[in-house]
C-alpha cells in the first residue's frame, strides 16, 4: 500500500498519487499505467490476474491478498460506471463512492473468470471482507449511513464502525471436489457466530494444510468449523475493542459479552454524557435503546469484566492533565 495506507489518487493520469503534494499517499509500482486512463482498481486486477496465471504456469500454489484501496477516500469516480449514477439527490462524492463499489465488484468478477479460465476455480477459496467499518460519504459519523441499519462509521464505538462484511466461498462450488470436501461451504448459508479478521491467518494455514511455526503466537481462531455452518464451542463469545486515543469516537473501550455490548467513555464529551452505555445486540442491533439504567447489575458486571480483560492485556489508558491514568471504574 501507500505510505499512509490509502491512495493519493485512483487515476492513472495522475500516477495514482505521484504528483506534487500527494507523494506520501502515492501507490507504489504500477509505473506502466502512469499517464494512462486506467483506473486503479482495473490496474490492480490486471496485475493480480497476471500473477495468478504465472503461479499456475509454474505449477505452484498461491495466496493472493487483493487490497483494492477502493472504497477508501479520496472518493474519485470510476468513469467506466459514472453514467449509471445520476441521482440529483445524491452528492458528487456519494455518486463517486457508488462507482468505486461497482469497480470492486467487477474486479472480483474478472478474477473469478480468470480462475475459471485457468481451471482452478474448484480449488480456490475466496474470502471477501472489509478491514474496518463503513466510511461512505453518507450520513453522519454516529448516525446511519452505508452500514445501515447498523449505527456509526469507521473509527466510532458503534457497530457500524467495527462490523464488516465477510463472505467465504469456493470460486466454483462443486460438492464432488476433494478439496471442497475438506471444507464444505453451503451456498447461501449464513453464520452468526462471532469472527474477527485475526482469524484469517490460522484459517488459511488450516485450509492449506500448513502447520503453525513452533512458538509462534496465534491471536485468532480457525474458522473452518464456522464456515462449514457449525458452532465452534471453544470460541469465547466476547470481543474487546480498546480505543484510548483521539480520533472520531475518542477515548473509549467497547466490550461485547454474548448478546450484550458495553461502551465505556474515559473522557465524555459533555458533562451530561454518561460514562457507560449498554445495549442488547440481539434485540437491538441498531443500538437505539440504551439499557444501563434498566440493567445496572449487568452494566456493572460488564465494566468489571472489561477492566479485568484490559489489565490482562496490559492495556494503556488515557491520562488526565495531571498525567494520571484514567482506568475504568464502576461509578453507579
Which functions belong to the PLM regions below?
Residues 200, 257, 267-275, 281-332:
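Long, internal low-complexity/basic segments
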Residues 61, 67-68, 103-142:
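Metal-dependent active-site segment of extracytoplasmic phospho-/sulfohydrolases and closely related
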